[in-house]
Amino acid sequence: MSASETPSASASRGLSYRDAGVDIEAGDALVDRIKPFAKRTLREGVLGGIGGFGALFEISKKYQEPVLVSGTDGVGTKLKLAFALNRHDTVGQDLVAMSVNDILVQGAEPLFFLDYFACGKLDVDTAATVIKGIAQGCELAGCALIGGETAEMPSMYPAGEYDLAGFAVGAVEKRKIIDGTTIACGDVVLGLASSGAHSNGYSLVRKIIEVSRPDLNADFHGQRLQDAIMAPTRIYVKPLLALIDKLPVKGMAHITGGGLVENVPRVLPEGVTAVLHQDAWTLPPLFQWLQKAGNVADDEMHRVFNCGIGMIVIVSAADAPAAIAHLKDAGETVYQIGEIRARQPGEAQTIVI
């Protein structure tokens, strides 16, 4: 409907989907833009291409007793910063990382990924940038971007905003599922460095920014502060799958919402406690800034942010040196940050001292 056209005149000529706010041509243009990104993620097992009603994937015959492991997640309020900063190149990797790192914890190899992109009005350039990041995340994880959904829903979202959700499916041999049941006193807790705040705690990050009003373009340890804040979530899949093939990994924990103190207990058996030593690694500059700018207590930091540790790996004391060497050779920064001991009455299952 033109600016001079009345609603009744528009109705008399016949309404279209575009009149309702849905641009089919824009959706088609987006599909054409993202096909090359998805194609680069193809791997063994993918049957067919983008555009079918369902996405097909054949489980490799290398698995004798495959168990499917699935995970779904979003990016949370980190998206609000993406909108404010008009930078959409990192949140796609965030989306993939949140799900593939979760299923990795149980020993699963990520096989394929699907995404959901919802907006009020589709901006092809923005959506293509986001989905390119999703595809790049899939490449890092070794999984195929096998399908997805783009939903343009007028009046559902403010102008310039969108929401993301993702879904990963992986497989693990039934006898190789990592469930934490073999964790015992004397085992060693290794911490793999995070790339930043990943995709958790951003409601607090945004509040700290609101209160402290920093210059997000200011230099921050060799980069802009906004670059440190928006750094994409690290994907640990390939180094850890290789480690699992090399030696017995007893347990892993993806450090997401709830931080170290709430995520590590999720993989521990009854009767043991993980004792983590905060002097075993240096709190990265971003978290030092967040704590100082927001006057955030230590306990709050540990239950909101990853504090520089994005993944926990638990191995026997005998296997710890080999595990550390392997992970370092794979390009990971790894710290020996704690140990497993008997749990005392009334004690939390993870303590930071």
Swiss-Prot record:
The keyword rRNA-binding does not apply. Its main location: cytoplasm. The keyword ATP-binding applies. Pathway: Purine metabolism; IMP biosynthesis via de novo pathway; 5-amino-1-(5-phospho-D-ribosyl)imidazole from N(2)-formyl-N(1)-(5-phospho-D-ribosyl)glycinamide: step 2/2. InterPro entries: PurM-like_C_dom, PurM-like_C_sf, PurM-like_N, PurM-like_N_sf, PurM_cligase. Keywords: ATP-binding, Cytoplasm, Ligase, Nucleotide-binding, Purine biosynthesis. Its EC number is 6.3.3.1. GO terms for molecular function: ATP binding; phosphoribosylamine-glycine ligase activity; phosphoribosylformylglycinamidine cyclo-ligase activity. GO terms for biological process: 'de novo' IMP biosynthetic process; adenine biosynthetic process. It catalyses: 2-formamido-N(1)-(5-O-phospho-beta-D-ribosyl)acetamidine + ATP = 5-amino-1-(5-phospho-beta-D-ribosyl)imidazole + ADP + phosphate + H(+). GO terms for cellular component: cytosol. NCBIfam families: purM. This is Phosphoribosylformylglycinamidine cyclo-ligase. It comes from Ralstonia nicotianae (strain ATCC BAA-1114 / GMI1000).
